[in-house]
Amino acid sequence: MRLHKRPVYGLDIETDTTIDGLDPAVAPVITVALSNASFDEVFTGREDEILCAVDDRLATMEPGVIATWNGAAFDLPFLAERAALHGIFLGLRLRYDRSIHLEHPPLAGHPGAYRARWHDHGHIDAYRLYRGDVGPALRVSCALKSIARLVGLAPIEVDRTKIHELSHEALHAYAASDARLARVLTERRWATAARFVDRIAPQGDAAVA
């Protein structure tokens, strides 16, 4: 199957912001959202059940490309570390890449950003795609919501420091929106995005610091 015919699956996570939602040592994952052109799915509940359910779902989906927004430095290593704390094996493979430049400090306990694949799915961090050209050319922030508004999309916005205060329905909608935006922004630039898909072997190292 040629790369351009593979489906794109947006992925986004939300973490418990009660203490520090940016530290995987203390903050559990409370929601994971997946988005494809034909569905939006949101996983909630106990963290161990979320991790297993997402992994099982990805294992059964047609091989494609997982699109994240800053997932190389946040979402994917966060999920990997939380799974390790539970003793859960995921089909998520990470490889640290020191060549990926970070604008902000790395995730707590990690050296930087990673290349990834999950089961038979490749990975693209769409944030790095847009930061590489759109950001410098237009001198705009490459935050997900900023880019979405720039191209005419309507993101759902909340106070990210108070994710734990959102209602069940609001959390579902917010997570699904972010996963959908990552997917759509990748699909809209697929001719270029295809070249940004991570290239690592399926049996690469599971890199959790």
Where are the language model's segments positioned?
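Common nucleic-acid-contacting/processivity interface regions adjacent to the catalytic cores
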Residues: T161-A209
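Conserved RNase H-like, two-metal-ion catalytic cores of nucleic-acid enzymes
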Residues: M1-A67
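Conserved DEDDh/DEDDy metal-dependent 3′-5′ exonuclease domain
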Residues: E41-R139
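C-terminal or mid-to-C-terminal helical accessory/interaction module adjacent to the motor/catalytic core
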Residues: D133-V134, R139-L171
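Intrinsically disordered or highly flexible coil/loop and linker segments, enriched in small
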Residues: P63, A67, P136, I156-E157, ...
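Generic, well-ordered alpha-helical scaffold segments in large soluble proteins
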Residues: R57, M61, F78, R82, ...
